[in-house]
From Swiss-Prot:
GO cellular component: chloroplast
Sequence positions bearing N-acetylproline: P3
Main localization (coarse): plastid
N6-carboxylysine found at: K201
Function per UniProt: RuBisCO catalyzes two reactions: the carboxylation of D-ribulose 1,5-bisphosphate, the primary event in carbon dioxide fixation, as well as the oxidative fragmentation of the pentose substrate in the photorespiration process. Both reactions occur simultaneously and in competition at the same active site.
Active site as annotated: K175, H294
Name used for this protein in its record: Ribulose bisphosphate carboxylase large chain
Length: 475
């Protein structure tokens, strides 16, 4: 190497390792309206200061790497780097901190949840300086929201398509989830829809197995729902699961569903992936299909309190990627969900503008501008005695989904559906009359039993069934 070359290499570049906090911890930074803001729950390794840990998260999820590189001089790191701008200790926890990070919008591809997550959570969670890391919330700026189509149709358009107003929608997951032939599966669908449900549903792992190939299932389910529609005079739907091993196969199934004339298809958005989900959502918008989303695999990501991604972030990501329904817990059933936290992300799914409210786990004010809303689906271990609480907790813009709570009725599927519909109508009427569902719920259900033998039988079967475990998802 010539002396001249050595001189040039030494100007403006000093090799070596620097503390992250020197460049990426900026407590004086004033966030911009266009920044994506993240709240991380950080547990540093012993001996690592919280400022260094927060700065490391900002660096490793944006422009930083473990050492200084000479190509840093070829761009403006101040323009593109993430910045840890605020740190606060977590009340009641040792060595846990909420670190707030701001990311410039130019770091992200427009309309791509895949790219957003690859940047923010793709690599940093394995960082050795951190004992644990959890993404608690994101603030998506309106300028980025507007690059997404979002849900194919949204709440109001769905109600107009179904011609159903003023109450929650009722659904049922067909059980057993695996093992039925396509014809017997279709028979169960017909009985549930004829009995008064609005929807029936493929379970998340019903795809195209040897005992029931997807095309056969689609045909028998379409026949069932059209027959139920003709008999009841109500529009019916069955969530036909289009999830597949490839995007091409997924789209083939969605196209076939559209050709059958059914109103709705389904996708497992986490196991299927955000790229596949967004592709399907765009197709559904263009072709008049509603899109039901199952969150299979979510608890692997969001169950631990100090590591992973909170479901409110996954819910926001789904609203951006696209879906008209998504499972959101029940508060009262067999699956995880603390009331205030659940209602926090339910509002993030449905409402246009949500204020910051730390008591419900909402770290940032979120403005969705014109992005359509998503119906939350309450499903998992619920039955007729839960109907007053579910109606009171979730309100009209929701789907209440009873699998075993329909199919487990002692008289069969159709009476099980009748029992759920009667219970729902009784609760909605009582609420509209000004009665307190939380206090008078059992009385309302017992009164309805007097004129519905199907409901009376259901109440007798499930009167002792409770799932009383402490929720792990707490503040």
């Amino acid at each position: 190497m010539s002396p001249q070359t050595e001189t040039k290499a030494s100007v403006g570049f000093k090799a070596g390792v620097k503390d992250y906090k020197l460049n990426y911890y900026t407590p004086d930074y004033v966030t911009k309206d266009t920044d994506i803001l993240a709240a991380f729950r950080v547990t540093p390794q012993p001996g690592v200061p919280p400022e260094e840990a927060g700065a490391a998260v900002a660096a490793e999820s944006s422009t930083g790497t473990w050492t200084t590189v000479w190509t840093d001089g070829l761009t403006s790191l101040d323009r593109y780097k993430g910045r840890c701008y605020h740190i606060e200790p977590v009340a009641g926890e040792d060595n846990q901190y909420i670190c707030y990070v701001a990311y410039p919008l130019d770091l992200f591809e427009e309309g791509s949840v895949t790219n957003m997550f690859t940047s923010i959570v793709g690599n940093v969670f394995g960082f050795k300086a951190l004992r644990a890391l959890r993404l608690e919330d994101l603030r998506i700026p309106t300028s980025y929201v507007k690059t997404f189509q979002g849900p194919p149709h949204g709440i109001q358009v769905e109600r107009d398509k179904l011609n159903k107003y003023g109450r929650p929608l009722l659904g049922c997951t067909i059980k057993p989830k695996l093992g039925l032939s396509a014809k017997n599966y279709g028979r169960a669908v017909y009985e549930c829809l004829r009995g008064g449900l609005d929807f029936t549903k493929d379970d998340e792992n019903v795809n195209s197995q040897p005992f029931m190939r997807w095309r056969d299932r689609f045909l028998f389910c379409a026949e069932a729902l059209f027959k139920a529609q003709a008999e009841t005079g109500e529009i019916k739907g069955h969530y036909l699961n289009a999830t597949a091993g490839t995007c091409e196969e997924m789209m083939k199934r969605a196209v076939f569903a559209r050709e059958l004339g059914v109103p709705i298809v389904m996708h497992d958005y986490l196991t299927g992936g955000f790229t596949a989900n967004t592709t399907l959502a765009h197709y559904c918008r263009d072709n008049g299909l509603l899109l039901h989303i199952h969150r299979a695999m979510h608890a692997v990501i969001d169950r631990q309190k100090n590591h992973g991604i909170h479901f409110r972030v996954l819910a926001k990501a789904l609203r951006m990627s696209g879906g008209d329904h998504i499972h959101a817990g029940t508060v009262v059933g067999k699956l995880e969900g603390e009331r205030e936290i659940t209602l926090g992300f339910v509002d993030l799914l449905r409402d246009d503008f949500i204020e910051k409210d730390r008591s419900r786990g909402i770290y940032f004010t979120q403005d969705w501008v014109s992005l359509p809303g998503v119906l939350p689906v309450a499903s998992g271990g619920i039955h007729v005695w839960h109907m007053p609480a579910l109606t009171e907790i979730f309100g009209d813009d929701s789907v209440l989904q009873f699998g075993g709570g329909t199919l487990g009725h002692p008289w069969g599927n159709a009476p099980g559906a009748v029992a759920n519909r009667v219970a729902l109508e009784a609760c909605v009427q009582a609420r509209n009359e000004g009665r307190d569902l939380a206090r008078e719920g059992n009385e309302i259900i017992r009164a309805a039993c007097k004129w519905s033998p199907e409901l009376a039988a259901a109440c007798e079967v499930w009167k002792e069934i409770k799932f009383e475990f402490e929720a792990m998802d707490t503040l």
